[in-house]
């Protein structure tokens, strides 16, 4: 193993305790996902406490649309991570380099396309979801600004996925922590000092996302390893892209279909007015945090399986999958019990409006029954 691999503490999961590898690799991923989730959640916290329930409903009404697209590309990034971790595990440096270049090139192209399309269709998507007239202008404003900077989110997710695939979970976590703190500061600054409302939290989010993306690209560019990003070599290798899509597309479609169903539910929630929308928004934010441990275990298992398949140890890869499923089940049941008891206190973090609290607690407790699935 090279000097830089030792310095970055790259994790070779092809030997040693499976449980220990998964837990130790999951912890930094969990914190990273926590910081990632803070972006939109902080937006809701700030507008809910400093602007009003209509602004909270506006931000919340966009979540399912954003997630539908972002989760699709997150699924594709899982495919890229599996391919890269396989080449890393098999020490195929040439293929590793090509996989990195292909991943980044595709990300840039998708970011540009998604930005253009998203800004244009954002108002129409919200109208299709029957967003109330008193919320629609704020929702459209937030969503269009968000789409304007979505490339930063995609680049960070793909770039940090590359680093995690070769065992570097520390720096993506540090970068995301830095940008999350930046987002909180900018949220409060734009909303309280400049009274920018919903637009302020949207701008704070995309500025912070571009900061984290720039840091990840800098690390990949400055690396001396074969996963280094060489701009002049940036291209799409068709065979590698096919491998990425064969794994990533099913994962992306699965995740985006779930988000699509949430968007469908959101359209019915919108019929009941801004208080119900705000209560649903509070529930979804909490639900997204609750799912983070299981999501992080899944990401750790992806890298574990990828490296062991690259090392041609299928039996160990299967054992790792079973261990990950067991850990996820235990954690989900524990968190469901805690949230059932403390549901009102968690909803009150976002809003103290009695109607919002009533709806939020109802949604949270109903959905806890299905968390383990």
Predicted regions and their residues:
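Signature of the first transmembrane helix
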Residues: 20-81, 85, 249-269
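Helix-terminus/linker motif at the lipid-water interface of multi-pass membrane proteins
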Residues: 34, 38-56, 126-133, 189-196, ...
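Small-residue-rich hydrophobic transmembrane alpha-helices
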Residues: 56-116, 153-172, 279-343
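Short membrane-interface helical motifs at transmembrane helix boundaries
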Residues: 113-144, 334-357, 361
């Amino acid at each position: 193993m090279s000097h830089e691999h030792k310095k970055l503490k790259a994790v070779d999961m092809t030997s040693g305790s499976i449980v220990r590898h998964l837990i130790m690799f999951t912890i930094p991923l969990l914190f990273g996902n926590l910081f990632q989730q803070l972006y939109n959640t902080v937006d809701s916290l700030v507008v809910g406490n400093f602007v009003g329930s209509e602004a909270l409903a506006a931000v919340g009404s966009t979540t399912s649309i954003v997630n539908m697209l972002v989760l699709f590309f997150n699924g594709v990034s899982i495919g890229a991570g599996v391919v890269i971790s396989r080449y890393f595990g098999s020490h195929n440096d040439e293929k590793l380099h090509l996989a990195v270049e292909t991943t980044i090139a595709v990300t840039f192209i998708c970011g540009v396309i998604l930005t253009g399309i998203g800004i244009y269709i954002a108002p129409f998507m919200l109208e299709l979801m029957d967003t109330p007239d008193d919320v629609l202008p704020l929702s459209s404003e937030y969503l269009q600004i968000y789409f304007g900077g979505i490339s930063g989110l995609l680049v960070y997710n793909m770039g940090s996925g590359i680093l995690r695939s070769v065992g570097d979970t520390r720096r993506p976590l540090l970068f995301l922590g830095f940008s999350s703190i930046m987002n909180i500061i900018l949220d409060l600054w734009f909303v309280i000092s400049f009274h920018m409302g919903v637009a302020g939290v949207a701008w704070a989010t995309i500025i912070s996302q571009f900061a984290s993306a720039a840091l990840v690209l800098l690390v990949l560019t400055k690396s001396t390893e074969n996963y280094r990003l060489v701009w002049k070599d940036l291209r799409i290798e068709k065979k590698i892209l096919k491998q990425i899509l064969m794994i990533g597309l099913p994962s992306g479609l699965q995740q985006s279909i779930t988000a699509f169903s949430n968007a469908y539910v959101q359209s019915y929630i919108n019929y009941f007015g801004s208080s119900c929308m705000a209560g649903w928004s509070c529930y979804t934010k909490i639900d997204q945090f609750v799912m983070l441990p299981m999501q992080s275990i899944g990401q750790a298992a992806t890298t574990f399986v990828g490296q062991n398949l690259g090392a041609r140890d299928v039996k160990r890869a299967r054992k790792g999958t079973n261990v990950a499923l067991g850990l996820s089940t235990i954690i989900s049941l524990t968190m469901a019990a805690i949230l059932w008891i403390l549901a009102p206190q968690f909803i009150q973090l976002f809003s103290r409006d009695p109607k919002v609290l009533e709806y939020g607690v109802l949604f949270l407790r109903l959905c806890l029954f299905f968390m383990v699935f």
